[in-house]
Regions:
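Switch II (G3) loop of P-loop NTPases
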Residues: 173-183
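Short loop/helix-cap segments at secondary-structure boundaries that form the rim of catalytic
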Residues: 33-34, 68-78, 143-145, 188-194, ...
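Acidic, Mg2+-coordinating active-site environments of NTP-dependent enzymes
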Residues: 7-9, 70-77, 171, 197-246
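Residue-level signal for inorganic ion chemistry
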Residues: 6, 37, 56, 93, ...
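Walker A (P-loop) phosphate-binding motif
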Residues: 95-141, 147-148
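P-loop NTPase switch/communication element
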Residues: 140-160, 164
Length: 246
């Protein structure tokens, strides 16, 4: 895929190089550097992968997406594109790379402090009984048409998420059902995905602290973001936080 096509929908500035490059894959782990790949530099909680840009180019990477300035003299020959949020750009580019598979399935997202896993399994069972072919992503892994794969996070990183959607679609799934965590929303793992149905189970003080959410109000606000990207919302009206969340 041409770099310019990969960047469809992404706001960027071309700092160096050409958009006519052929890109075979996207990486955000510097250890996977290879010719034909684009490296997305992400500012993490433990380290800043902009520090590995030169190493990646030396390993053959042909394009870089950066969130802040880097020393261009250390990345000769590579295309360099600057964006406001590299995580957001990773999500949109990953969707483009895999043909935006979520647009060709019914998308259902479930959020809440407790009950996400149970709820998704129940929904999956009901839909399958009705004849739907369902792919499911969540805390217990990925399930589709008799297959099971482990996952590192409740809501996987955007690249893995889009790759999984592609696998669902290629296998014949017509519905993608997933747990949507507040971290997944905050870290743009689900950026670019529109849900046909969003489901809210409940909310209680949890995931508050270093590396997660600073306050309960922030946590609630991120949970509510799911309902800004869905067509229909199904909520627990008995939860005292529902009105504020919406």
């Amino acid at each position: 895929m041409k770099l310019e096509q990969l960047l469809e929908g992404v706001s960027y500035t071309l700092v160096q190089g050409s958009l006519e490059l052929d890109i075979e894959d996207i990486i955000y782990d510097s250890r996977k550097a290879a010719p034909g790949r684009l490296f997305v530099c992400i500012v993490g909680t433990q380290r800043d992968s902009h520090d590995y840009a030169a190493q990646c180019v030396a390993g053959g990477v042909t394009a870089l997406v950066v969130q802040h300035d880097i020393d261009l003299s250390t990345v000769p020959g590579a295309a360099v594109l600057k964006v406001e949020s590299s995580r957001y750009a990773l999500a949109l580019m990953s969707g483009n790379l895999f043909g935006n598979p979520s647009r060709r399935m019914t998308m259902i997202g479930v959020t809440g402090t407790k009950g996400k896993t149970t709820t998704t399994h129940m929904i999956k069972s009901v839909l399958e009984a009705a004849g739907r072919k369902v792919g499911m992503i969540g805390t217990n892994g990925v399930y589709f048409l008799g297959h099971h794969q482990e996952t590192a996070n409740t809501t996987p990183e955007s690249y893995e998420l889009q790759k999984t959607f592609r696998e669902f679609l290629d296998a014949g799934c017509d519905t993608a059902l997933m747990e949507v965590s507040s971290q997944g929303l905050m870290m743009d793992r689900v950026a670019g995905i529109h849900y046909d149905i969003g489901v809210f189970t409940n909310l209680s003080p949890d995931h508050i602290g270093p590396g997660e959410h600073k306050t309960f109000e922030e946590y609630r606000s991120w949970k509510g973001q799911l309902f800004k990207r869905c067509t229909t919302g199904v909520v627990n009206i008995d939860d005292e936080n529902t009105e504020a969340l919406l």
